[in-house]
């Protein structure tokens, strides 16, 4: 069972090359599992025992199950996570030429460890908008180059003798990916959009804008003599997305409403309309309650009696730097789920919530660690 879950997780990681693609893969899973799609801005008709999902603003998803014995005012139980990760986004008009190479201007997104991106095969994926008959509703299309088209070359040690003493990398200089060897007569203007149009099968002038992240094109894999480690890009936080999605697919709770929620933009503060620090989730939960015949007061009752898991990864105790972990509350790889708690309220936990989760873990013999 664990091996099967690992194989499914690896497949999910491979397909999650941008937040848009993660959400699309989640929708594919919901469709295969018999969930009904809802429109964010259309009326809903919900039934007891039904499974549904709604996509919000491209990269946020709420998938939920209505209990077959649902009564208005019963609790919401949610498991939420984020689908973005630290990476680079490609700027508009990105083309530059230097040293016989075409390269692209990028912007860092989230908390980066820049040097981990050097000398790797990189690709790009995301969403483009195209001209349509309605200027207020451009066509949206997901794109993925699906092969290494970029690399960020490191500086050879012969040109940087102090590299092993620590080097500060400037994203606007040191981290620009190269994409093509060029001659002196190369016309850089519009080159990237032309390649993007070729990929999408449209004319370059049809492309209005794009939202494209660079991703590590290396495949996830198991490593270690016993294959007890998984090395992969995007573990933070596609692993949690995988967990909550498979949780909702297997949910059959008879009462209340149970939901899996995928948010975007956690790495930059969650303040967008598709982020956790927006009104979107509350509005969608209220819409669920209304469609099930609940009053405003009963909706508030559902919130007050509800519970939400905030699912994210935790830092394991580093084998080479154990001194950097907390002396008594730390997580060790492969020793169980980490229950994260912080008295400055950095995490969405307190004694009651932790107690509930510990009770669940004890009831079902789930190993866990305090973090």
Task: Give residue spans per PLM region.
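N-terminal hydrophobic/helix-forming segments and targeting peptides
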Residues: 1-371
């Amino acid at each position: 069972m664990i091996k099967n879950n690992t194989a499914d997780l690896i497949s999910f990681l491979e397909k999650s090359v941008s937040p848009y693609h993660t959400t699309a893969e989640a929708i594919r899973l919901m469709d295969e599992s018999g969930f009904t799609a809802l429109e964010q801005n259309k009326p809903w008709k919900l039934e007891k025992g039904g499974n549904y999902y709604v996509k919000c603003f491209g990269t946020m998803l709420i998938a939920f199950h209505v209990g077959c014995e649902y009564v208005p005012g019963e609790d919401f139980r949610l498991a939420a996570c984020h689908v973005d990760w630290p990476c680079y986004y490609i700027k508009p008009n990105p083309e530059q030429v230097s040293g016989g190479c075409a390269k692209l201007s990028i912007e860092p997104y989230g908390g980066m460890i820049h040097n981990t991106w050097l000398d790797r095969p990189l690709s790009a994926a995301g969403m483009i908008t195209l001209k349509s008959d309605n200027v207020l509703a451009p066509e949206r299309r997901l794109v993925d180059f699906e092969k290494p088209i970029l690399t960020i070359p490191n500086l050879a040690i012969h040109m940087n003798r102090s590299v092993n003493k620590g080097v500060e990398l400037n994203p606007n200089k040191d981290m620009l990916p190269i994409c093509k060897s060029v001659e002196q007569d190369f016309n850089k203007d519009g080159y990237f959009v032309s390649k993007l149009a070729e990929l999408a099968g449209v004319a370059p002038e049809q492309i209005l804008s794009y939202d494209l992240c660079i991703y590590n094109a290396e495949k996830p894999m198991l490593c270690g003599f016993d294959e007890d480690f998984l090395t992969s890009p995007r573990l933070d936080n596609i692993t949690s997305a995988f967990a909550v999605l498979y949780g909702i697919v297997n949910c059959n709770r008879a009462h209340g409403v149970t939901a899996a929620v995928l948010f975007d933009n956690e790495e930059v503060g969650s303040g967008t309309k598709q982020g956790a620090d927006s009104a979107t989730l509350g509005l969608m939960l209220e819409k669920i309650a209304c469609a099930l015949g609940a009053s405003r007061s009963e909706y508030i009752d559902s919130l007050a009696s509800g519970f939400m898991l905030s699912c994210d990864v935790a830092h394991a105790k580093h084998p080479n730097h154990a001194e950097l972990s907390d002396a008594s509350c730390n997580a060790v790889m492969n020793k169980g789920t980490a229950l994260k708690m912080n008295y400055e309220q950095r995490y969405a936990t307190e004694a009651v919530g932790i107690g509930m989760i510990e009770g669940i873990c004890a009831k079902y013999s789930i190993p866990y660690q305090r973090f």
